[in-house]
Amino acid sequence: MEAPGPAQAAAAESNSREVTEDAADWAPALCPSPEARSPEAPAYRLQDCDALVTMGTGTFGRVHLVKEKTAKHFFALKVMSIPDVIRRKQEQHVHNEKSVLKEVSHPFLIRLFWTWHEERFLYMLMEYVPGGELFSYLRNRGHFSSTTGLFYSAEIICAIEYLHSKEIVYRDLKPENILLDRDGHIKLTDFGFAKKLVDRTWTLCGTPEYLAPEVIQSKGHGRAVDWWALGILIFEMLSGFPPFFDDNPFGIYQKILAGKLYFPRHLDFHVKTGRMM
């Protein structure tokens, strides 16, 4: 199903009973009950934005680049099909992303400004990050220098430490989920797997190449999985490929559990001995 642009969605919004920051009548898992909050005027409205281009498509939605008509600010508008979200059982992931982003505020994390929904679509107005994905730069360059890898790693560490201070585990660190702003600094995005966590959880989620052994073995996992994923990311940034890869996920899992690393020759001594940081 094709997601509507802001112009079409604005018509639906003007006909709705009430426009608040979050509507609450379509899926309890995604929205709090009306009694849990007091109505308040929205900071943004769909009809106040012009759609410029579709920046990306996913399994149940699209991301549009939009511009606010009066202030001329640019935003990324994430439009998700509610029936597709429910059919693919992604309600919890959408809820996780929204609740986490509403709680956090950090220069290396994507910002969420506003959410709204009408009968068939859910909207998330987010910060526009013009530099694109770290993944694209890594594939174009092949691999990064130790200096570049150290720069990105330091900023990612700051972001992860902040999330952990809020008792939030990110659980989906990978090059595709790291955006670069106009000055080259990182922004973590896609918080669908993020979770508020005091102790441990047993959910199997994430990208196969980046899963920690305790996740694969269903032993319960906590914050340490983010640091494991950072190690995998550092290896991939400096070598051009992840340390454990195979044609199928089960082969990847076996190699992760075996724990054997093979370093490319071009990696310097400090990287191989873990003294890079």
Curated annotation (Swiss-Prot):
Disease: A chromosomal aberration involving PRKY is a cause of sex reversal disorder. Translocation t(X;Y)(p22;p11) with PRKX. Chromosomal translocations proximal to PRKY account for about 30% of the cases of sex reversal disorder in XX males and XY females.
Catalytic residues (positions): D172
Catalytic activity annotation: L-seryl-[protein] + ATP = O-phospho-L-seryl-[protein] + ADP + H(+); L-threonyl-[protein] + ATP = O-phospho-L-threonyl-[protein] + ADP + H(+)
GO terms, biological process: cell adhesion; protein phosphorylation; signal transduction
Similarity annotation: Belongs to the protein kinase superfamily. AGC Ser/Thr protein kinase family. cAMP subfamily.
Biased composition (Low complexity): 1-12
UniProt keyword list: ATP-binding, Chromosomal rearrangement, Kinase, Nucleotide-binding, Phosphoprotein, Serine/threonine-protein kinase, Transferase
Positions bound to ATP: M55, G56, T57, G58, T59, F60, G61, R62, V63, K78
Pfam family, one: Pkinase
UniProt name for this protein: Putative serine/threonine-protein kinase PRKY
Top-level EC class as recorded in UniProt: transferase
Cross-referenced SUPFAM superfamilies: Protein kinase-like (PK-like)
Tissue and organ distribution: Ubiquitous.
Domain Protein kinase, first and last residues per copy: 49-277
SMART domains for this protein: S_TKc
E.C. number(s) listed in UniProt: 2.7.11.1
A GO cellular component annotation in the UniProt record: cytosol
Phosphothreonine carried by residues: T203
GO molecular function: ATP binding; cAMP-dependent protein kinase activity; protein serine kinase activity; protein serine/threonine kinase activity
Xref: PANTHER family: CAMP-DEPENDENT PROTEIN KINASE CATALYTIC SUBUNIT PRKX-RELATED, CYCLIC NUCLEOTIDE-DEPENDENT PROTEIN KINASE
